[in-house]
Amino acid sequence: MKCPGVSDCVATVRHDNVFAIAAGLRWSAAVPPLHKGDAVTKLLVGAIAGGMLACAAILGDGIASADTALIVPGTAPSPYGPLRSLYHFNPAMQPQIGANYYNPTATRHVVSYPGSFWPVTGLNSPTVGSSVSAGTNNLDAAIRSTDGPIFVAGLSQGTLVLDREQARLANDPTAPPPGQLTFIKAGDPNNLLWRAFRPGTHVPIIDYTVPAPAESQYDTINIVGQYDIFSDPPNRPGNLLADLNAIAAGGYYGHSATAFSDPARVAPRDITTTTNSLGATTTTYFIRTDQLPLVRALVDMAGLPPQAAGTVDAALRPIIDRAYQPGPAPAVNPRDLVQGIRGIPAIAPAIAIPIGSTTGASAATSTAAATAAATNALRGANVGPGANKALSMVRGLLPKGKKH
């Protein structure tokens, strides 16, 4: 049952007993009591009182509407087997995105849009730019056709839709009031794009123009997964181990999982809140990982014994964490990245020790010998003129500046 308003409910019948039970209002002496023998009137009063109690239970104090959650999922699964094995998200989990960060009784609706990433999602699929544009229009229509309060939750590419919608509403005088909307973003790729490119830069390979951060009038929740290349990219991309670890986190371990995290389990030191000039808050939850994504990948895909994972993690984590140290990131030359491969064999001794302890000393000896050979081979490696052509091809995919 739905009452158009508390005043509409209580104005129907004026009787002290009804007021006292259903609305808690004071008795009015001007209203005469019911006659004891008036059975029909008693039934009428009882029915209205029951209806008003239902209104009170549904609406609580004052007038309110049921909460709604609009959910914008991430990129759709790839039709290609090898790519699907690297990134796969079960569509059945879409309604659960961000569910721990809003009212659990909210009615959930998944906003339909392509969720495509040409060519990963198919040679005939739309580009990221086209997909985000369609998603923004669909989300905007859903917001305007839904009574508040509304929680808008997005994952990965879905957060690009949320970012664009917030920017649109920031300049729209007909936008819903600030208290009606809350945006929840898990694994926002714009964190990576803002780190790599200036706002207004068009990235041809994904047909996407990097937006400027919007000064939104709505409260926002950001969910950031530690080491996730999309939401927590390395500050120093010249650290190749950190790059590999971030790719592992973004592709398979950790990126999507942040959408299902529980804010109650996040340590206070990993929760930050800022307030912008419009009075809206942005609360960031930093979801830490107990094991490096790269180490998990080594266990799952490279045969690293699980009992060796802790030792390898302890050896690699300090090296990887150096890429996240605060301060301006140094300029990176593509040649420096290639030459940085020389440092990778240095991790082999750390891996060789636990492997040897679990599979025999001969394995450790063989690994050490292979490490020495690889180190000697890479010591003489150099990026010469032969690499210029390849680097030129890569530059062709890089941003060309603003797109008008």
Curated annotation (Swiss-Prot):
Keywords: Acyltransferase, Cell inner membrane, Cell membrane, Lipid biosynthesis, Lipid metabolism, Membrane, Transferase, Transmembrane, Transmembrane helix. One of its GO terms (cellular component) is plasma membrane. It is found in: Cell inner membrane. The keyword Lipoprotein does not apply. It comes from Mycobacterium tuberculosis (strain ATCC 25618 / H37Rv). The chain crosses the membrane at residues 43-63. Disruption phenotype: Inactivation of the mmpL8 gene interrupts the normal biosynthesis of SL-1 and leads to the accumulation of the precursor SL1278. One of its GO terms (biological process) is lipid metabolic process. Its main location: membrane. Residues 64-404 are cytoplasmic. Its EC number is 2.3.1.284. InterPro entries: AB_hydrolase_fold (IPR029058), PE-PPE_C (IPR013228). It comes from the Bacteria. It catalyses: 3 3'-(hydroxy)phthioceranyl-2'-palmitoyl(stearoyl)-2-O-sulfo-alpha,alpha-trehalose = 3,6,6'-tris-(hydroxy)phthioceranyl-2-palmitoyl(stearoyl)-2'-sulfo-alpha-alpha-trehalose + 2 2'-palmitoyl/stearoyl-2-O-sulfo-alpha,alpha-trehalose. Activity is potentiated by the SL-1 transporter MmpL8. Inhibited by the lipase inhibitor tetrahydrolipstatin (THL). Involved in the final steps of the cell wall sulfolipid-1 (SL-1) biosynthesis. Catalyzes two successive acylations of the precursor 2-palmitoyl-3-(C43)-phthioceranyl-alpha, alpha'-D-trehalose-2'-sulfate (SL1278) to yield the tetraacylated sulfolipid SL-1. It is an enzyme of class 2 (transferase). This is SL1278 acyltransferase Chp1. Residues 104-325 form the PE-PPE domain. It is a single-pass membrane protein. GO terms for molecular function: acyltransferase activity. It holds the Pfam family PE-PPE. Belongs to the mycobacterial PPE family. Residues 1-42 are periplasmic.
